[in-house]
Amino acid sequence: MTFVPSKIFFTKGVGRHREYLSSFELALRDAKIEKCNLVTVSSIYPPSCKRISIEEGLKHLSPGQITFCVMARNSTNERNRLIASSIGVALPADASQYGYLSEHHPYGETAEYAGEYAEDLAATMLATTLGIEFDSNTAWDEREEVYKMSGKIVKSFNVTQSAEGDKNGLWTTVISAAILLP
């Protein structure tokens, strides 16, 4: 049996609780995926996989369902500590080819910075598999132009959640996820 997902949606959430596990559960609830048994997989965006809205994606989920995902997750109970989770996405111009998803879970990075970093990771992984020539020492903005001008990478984006650690020391958890559907 071969299972290649045909649909994908992206979600994110944040949760705060005195218990670590409960803060994760609340982040899953905020992301609207708490009812699934999540199985994390590596970072390939399947060929010809259609991105759908979270509202459409949720219609395909049932309580207890085994659900494949790529997830970035981060937690802290340090007051005011900045945390983030980000999924970067890079898609090839040829939809019959696979793309890349990257996970990034930093401390001390803003949502914007973490998102750009995750997007850069995914785009760089895709560029290397497509044989695009680039200087890895240049800034992301410059490489993004090179990637897109090559005509081989059509789109890149990120889905990022950030939060500051709770001021009272509660556990704070952030998640970002790509949910893969049949």
UniProtKB/Swiss-Prot annotation:
| InterPro entries referenced in this protein's UniProt entry, alphabetically | Pyr-dep_his/arg-deCO2ase, Pyr-dep_his/arg-deCO2ase_sand, Pyruvoyl-dep_arg_deCO2ase
Q: Which cysteines are joined by disulfide bonds?
A: none
| Highest rank taxon of the organism | Bacteria
| Lyase in keyword set | yes
Q: What SUPFAM superfamilies does the entry give?
A: Pyruvoyl-dependent histidine and arginine decarboxylases
Top class in the EC scheme = lyase
Which residue positions does UniProt flag as site: Cleavage (non-hydrolytic)? 42-43
- Family statement drawn from the similarity comment of this UniProt entry: Belongs to the PdaD family.
Q: What's the name of the protein?
A: Probable pyruvoyl-dependent arginine decarboxylase
Native species: Chloroherpeton thalassium (strain ATCC 35110 / GB-78)
Q: What is the lineage of its organism?
A: Bacteria, Pseudomonadati, Chlorobiota, Chlorobiia, Chlorobiales
